[in-house]
């Protein structure tokens, strides 16, 4: 379902398995219709890394709460149902999230405790059913964007009728043969560029689509009028 973006996602997962504790400076963002199979992928990654190292049920408010402790000891997290477009200041909220995704050291303030600095080992998937869930510009560096374009009926058919869901559920059983095979696979994926994970996130076509949707309506309207030579930009070639 992920298509050509799978290569990068595969490298991301392999990096977490082969080099636990290494901070990846960007997150994988998946948008799709509800029921797009995102939860199954999260469960598989959590099983591969060890459920005690992961939290696949995070939400935005948890992440940015003043007294949040969810990042303590966390290796992998999934931020679910993200939709910052529904919040008052999408730009400010996106910036809050960026710090958690990219900074190797975070300052937290546990309730009734003094501030402390903690190492940030956590790497993230972000899931949303809304493809305008973040505020992005062309210069954004921390999000690898994948939009799963299949309709829900198509996804359910492949998961249910073609047996993929049963295979995944079987693999989720503790110490199952399928899970061992999958872990062996990712342990042997050749990581082509370790430095990639410390650089800017690779840009995808889906990224630029989301950038376009992040622009305010007035900006899109003015650009459209400019490129189509309409008022107030019309010109007679002079």
Descriptions of predicted regions:
Residues 67-72, 109-127:
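AAA+/SF3 P-loop NTPase mechanochemical coupling elements
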Residues 34, 192-238:
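DNA transaction DNA-binding modules
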Residues 75-101, 133-140:
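Conserved AAA+/SF3 P-loop NTPase catalytic/coupling segment centered on the Walker-B
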Residues 119-121, 136-213:
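Phosphate-sensing "switch" segment of ASCE/P-loop ATPases
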Residues 83-84, 129-133, 149-154:
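Conserved nucleotide-binding/hydrolysis micro-motifs of P-loop NTPases
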Residues 50, 92-116:
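Conserved catalytic/switch belt of AAA+ P-loop NTPases
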Residues 1-79, 93, 144, 182, ...:
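P-loop NTPase catalytic core of nucleic-acid-dependent motor ATPases
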């Amino acid at each position: 379902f992920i298509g050509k973006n799978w290569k990068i996602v595969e490298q991301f997962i392999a990096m977490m398995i082969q080099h636990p504790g290494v901070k990846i400076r960007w997150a994988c963002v998946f948008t799709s219709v509800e029921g797009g199979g995102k939860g199954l992928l999260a469960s598989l990654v959590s099983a591969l890394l060890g459920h005690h190292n992961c939290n696949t049920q995070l939400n935005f408010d948890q992440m940015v709460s003043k007294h949040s402790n969810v990042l303590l000891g966390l290796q992998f997290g999934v931020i679910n149902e993200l939709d910052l477009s529904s919040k008052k200041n999408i730009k400010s909220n996106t910036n809050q999230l960026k710090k958690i995704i990219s900074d190797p050291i975070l300052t937290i303030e546990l309730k009734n405790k003094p501030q402390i600095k903690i190492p940030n080992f956590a790497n993230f998937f972000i899931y949303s059913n809304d493809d305008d869930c973040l505020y992005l510009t062309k210069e954004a560096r921390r999000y690898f964007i994948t939009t799963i374009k299949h309709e829900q009926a198509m996804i359910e058919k492949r998961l249910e009728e073609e047996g993929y869901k049963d295979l995944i559920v079987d693999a989720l059983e503790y110490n199952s043969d399928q899970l061992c095979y999958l872990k062996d696979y990712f342990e042997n994926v050749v990581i082509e560029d370790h430095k990639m994970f410390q650089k800017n996130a690779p840009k995808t076509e889906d990224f630029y689509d989301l950038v376009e949707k992040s622009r305010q309506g007035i900006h899109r309207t003015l650009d459209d009028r400019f490129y189509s030579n309409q008022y107030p930009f019309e010109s007679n070639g002079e």
